[in-house]
Amino acid sequence: MPQHPRFRGEDFVWYEERCTGCASCAKFCPLGIIRIVTRPSGVMTKEGEKNALEVFDIDLARCMFCGLCVEACPYDALHMGSGFERARYTRKDLVINIDELRRAPKRPSTWFRPQLEAKGYNPHTDRPLEWHEVGRHEAPDLEAMQARWVEVR
């Protein structure tokens, strides 16, 4: 069955390389379905210290797929996925844990990332994307920045 690239599926795409363990996604979830437990890792990132994640659970049994967790993530580590076949017999099996998030196919929905759609990316037919390909904003090149400064002055 054909699906639109902006379809918000019942799975999540998580890029561990981008995640700092700040728990913004958990804080902004209106239903409180995201559980994160961290410990200091000592790894320095551009913005500050990165935490090591011990627990990262998403309870799909209660998720309403609003996407506020995706919008709240300042590092673009969490995205809505494009899968839709997560039927289970028990509610506890609907909890996605950190290992499942690591193994999940990296095919983010273009719902919150229209720049992916503008590039013609289709999560259902194209290859999985690496963490550096799904940023919220494209980094401008030097010429574009210089031209902007000239126009502003």
Question: Could you say what each language-model-derived stretch is?
Answer:
Residues 5-7, 29, 87-89:
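A generic structural signal for short, non-catalytic loop/turn and secondary-structure boundary residues
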Residues 45-53, 60-153:
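Flanking helices and flexible, charged tails adjoining ferredoxin-like Fe-S electron-transfer domains
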Residues 1-11, 33-52:
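Short, charged low-complexity linear segments at domain edges
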Residues 12-32, 57-76:
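Cysteine-centered iron-sulfur cluster-binding motifs in ferredoxin-type domains/subunits
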